[in-house]
Amino acid sequence: MSAAKPKVAKKARVAPAHPPSSQMVVAAVTALKERGGSSTQAIKKYIAANYTVDMTKQGPFIRRALVKGVASGALVQTKGKGASGSFKLGKKKEGKSDAQKARIAAKKAKLAAKKKEQREKKALKTKARKEKVAAKKAAKKATKKTKKVKKPAAKKAKKPAAKKPAAKKPAAKKAKKPAKKVAKPAKKAAAKPAKKAAKPAKKAAKPAKKAAKPAKK
């Protein structure tokens, strides 16, 4: 087995001898209180006098802190450009009061409600338009269906109407034929007995002629 390696004691982190460069720059400008702004040289002197720093090494960090301070609004550059010139503290943005916050919140809520109302109205209009179009389409379909249904109904109604008058003709013929048949036997029955009654009368006359012959002798 290999021997356990001895644990190396971690070096205690050395606390920095000075705060960050941005804090030192702001502290210097605040303490100097120059009306026209504090120069870069004056700020460096204040930091060197009040903090334990190596100005040779810290110089670039101070210049960077000045540029960043102007960009963020913590500092205002009154003269010069970049890290050179004069600097003073920027105006602190005052926190909005509760009344202002309430007004802003109410304004936002009102705008949101208005937008919502507009969206709802728009949605209702589009819905109504769609319903109207759908109703028109449905009405057109209904009219087409009714037209299709009406055509067969008209044909069916016409055919039975034409057949009904034809049914009346057989009824009229049946009534006339029996009347003719009844009339013919009546004529024959009346005529035949009359002829038969006349024949015996002729036969009765013949004997009278025979009786006259003896008178000639």
UniProtKB/Swiss-Prot annotation:
It comes from the Eukaryota. Keywords: Chromosome, DNA-binding, Nucleus. GO terms for molecular function: double-stranded DNA binding; nucleosomal DNA binding; structural constituent of chromatin. Its main location: nucleus. GO terms for cellular component: nucleosome; nucleus. It is found in: Nucleus; Chromosome. Transmembrane segments: none annotated. Residues 1-21, 80-217 are annotated as: Disordered. Residues 17-91 form the H15 domain. GO terms for biological process: chromosome condensation; negative regulation of DNA recombination; nucleosome assembly. Residues 114-123 have a biased composition (Basic and acidic residues). Belongs to the histone H1/H5 family. This is Histone H1-gamma, late. It comes from Strongylocentrotus purpuratus. The lineage of its organism: Eukaryota, Metazoa, Echinodermata, Eleutherozoa, Echinozoa.
